């Protein structure tokens, strides 16, 4: 694992310590306007509206192995958008790790259909 990517804001709380324990770098994925310089952007739809995430264009060297870490997997919009950003960076997504999965919302199935995974979950409700 070269890099752990965490999404704003609660994902930062988990992704940073995971990166530290793996001896990997940490890359924040943020909402628009919060990162200076050139960024890649990816919009996605939530159950209550839409959102956009951004990452520095030079955040990850091409070919790096990337783990996405977030707090909750619900509809999978945030993870799918982040996976798209990882792809735009030219990196290899090797997995997704989340603390809590809300299984009734079907996020894991959406990730499976999109070919995103493997997905590791600490607790499913």
Roles of regions detected by a PLM:
Residues 1-8:
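Short glycine-rich phosphate-binding loop at a beta-alpha junction
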Residues 2, 64, 94:
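Conserved acidic residues
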Residues 4, 26, 96:
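Residue-level signature of catalytic and energy-coupling elements of molecular machines
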Residues 6, 68-69:
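Generic enzyme active-site microenvironment
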Residues 13-22:
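Short Gly/Thr/Asp-enriched flexible loops that form oxyanion-binding sites at enzyme active sites
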Residues 23-67:
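Short, glycine/charge-rich flexible loops or terminal/linker lids adjacent to PRPP-binding catalytic cores
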Residues 71, 76:
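Conserved G/P- and acidic residue-centered "switch" motifs that form tight phosphate/ATP-binding loops
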Residues 81-125:
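PRPP-dependent phosphoribosyltransferase catalytic core
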């Amino acid at each position: 694992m070269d890099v752990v990517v965490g999404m704003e804001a609660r994902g930062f709380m988990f992704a940073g310590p995971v990166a530290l324990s793996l001896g990997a770098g940490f890359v924040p994925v943020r909402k628009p306007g919060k990162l200076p310089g050139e960024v890649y952007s990816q919009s996605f739809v939530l159950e209550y509206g839409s959102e956009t995430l951004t990452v520095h264009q030079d955040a990850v060297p091409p070919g790096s192995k990337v783990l996405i870490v977030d707090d909750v997997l619900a509809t999978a919009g945030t993870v799918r958008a982040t996976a798209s950003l990882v792809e735009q960076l030219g990196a290899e997504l090797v997995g997704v790790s989340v603390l809590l999965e809300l299984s009734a919302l079907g996020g894991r199935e959406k990730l499976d259909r999109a070919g995103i995974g493997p997905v590791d979950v600490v607790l499913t409700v």
